[in-house]
Curated annotation (Swiss-Prot):
Top-rank taxon, per record: Bacteria
PANTHER family: DEOXYGUANOSINETRIPHOSPHATE TRIPHOSPHOHYDROLASE-LIKE PROTEIN 2, DEOXYNUCLEOSIDE TRIPHOSPHATE TRIPHOSPHOHYDROLASE
Protein name: Deoxyguanosinetriphosphate triphosphohydrolase-like protein
InterPro entries, sorted: dGTPase, dGTPase-like, dNTPase_2, HD/PDEase_dom, HD_domain, PHydrolase_assoc_dom
Organism name: Shewanella sediminis (strain HAW-EB3)
Gene3D superfamilies recorded: Hypothetical protein af1432
A Gene Ontology biological process term: dGTP catabolic process
Pfam families cross-referenced by the UniProt entry: HD, HD_assoc
Family the UniProt entry places it in: Belongs to the dGTPase family. Type 2 subfamily.
CDD domains from the UniProt entry: HDc
MF term (GO), any: dGTPase activity
Amino acid sequence: MTESLWHERRLTEEKKRRNDHRSPYQRDRARILHSAAFRRLQAKTQVLGVGMNDFYRTRLTHSLEVSQIGTGIRAQLKQKRPEFDHLFDSMSLIESLCLAHDIGHPPFGHGGEVALNYMMRDHGGFEGNGQTFRILTGLEPYTEYYGMNLCRRTLLGILKYPAPYSSLYRASGNKPVNNIRQLKPSQWTPVKGIFDDDSGILDWVLEPLNGSDRERFLSHRDLGANKHLRTQFKSLDCSVMELADDIAYAVHDLEDAIVMGIVTPSQWQQDVASKLTLSHDAWIKEEFTNIGQNLFSHQHHLRKDAIGTLVNGFVTAIDIVEDRAFTDPLLRFNAGLDTSFSEALEVLKQFVYKYVIRKPEIQMLEYKGQQIVMELFEAFESDPERLLPTHTQERWRESHTKGLNSHRVIADYISGMTDEFAARLHQHLFNPKAGSMIELNGEL
């Protein structure tokens, strides 16, 4: 592993700041934490709609919790497998990845993502992870053209799906809808990968890899007829971040649902406890199956203790796994969850999906956001030089003049909006009784 290559940035920096002894990844963490894109996560949907309740988690609080879990995974791996400690760099690297992992997600969660993907169906598609990569490498104005100008290893770590859109896309056979209100998200699932517009940056990130490692890292698997292809591999750092994200999603979104009365003890018993009693792991059978009483307790401290038990159970069940087909240690080794705990985590994720995400009230909010995003896109696409903000107009005009993908500029603008801003902008454009646009001008 050539450390100096992984520390490289696309734009060489010669900043001389007095007594600045920070590591490269401490600098990356600071850039992410202080970015406008990160701050906007405070007003973007996690699972429950922004404004439904003061307790719920937003994308921002979710990202902070993912960072906490990610550093916990890193710390316990250091203790459990000290022989692999040299593979990990600064703790700030894991923090950076966890804080940044959701930066590209559009307003209104999955509804906004599907909406933008549909509107971009002939222009390279849209997907939140691809947009995260795009923000970090080009859009966030820390530099003029290179985004946050993060280290190569940080960018490698953010690549959950490391392959270009065009190599993964498979036509579904679905025809465009006659009316956008008829759009079914299941028919327009986004490709999980990097936009072709950014494939040159992906090439730069992967430069230190040898030919066989690169080819295997970019390879994909078939998920079945009419489904997009899916990448198979990720880096060591990314594997830690993804596990932290999965644990936070399953456990903390479950907590939101319990507190807000969306799920009941009987549903827990039927869909979770009954399945976990069949686990091959004695600890899961004993602890997880009997935790329901505390999870649903009206005593706050008992519920928090139960949540902590769940998180700790998953974090301490993570170990290092090896894939000897790779040469580079950053690809050869990944963090992996014990099989029994992986199955238990999947049970929790499916429980949240069934009783929370698929709940009609949540789906109505998602559907409304879907319509808002598509109607905004239609409006801006109809006359970009009239309706887009001045700075975005300039980007659109430059892209259009150079024969580049000018539709991507519109997707960039809308995906950067918060839920509230998108809703108010939609009101100003389409509601005759809405007030002046002036108060919106300085927000994005």
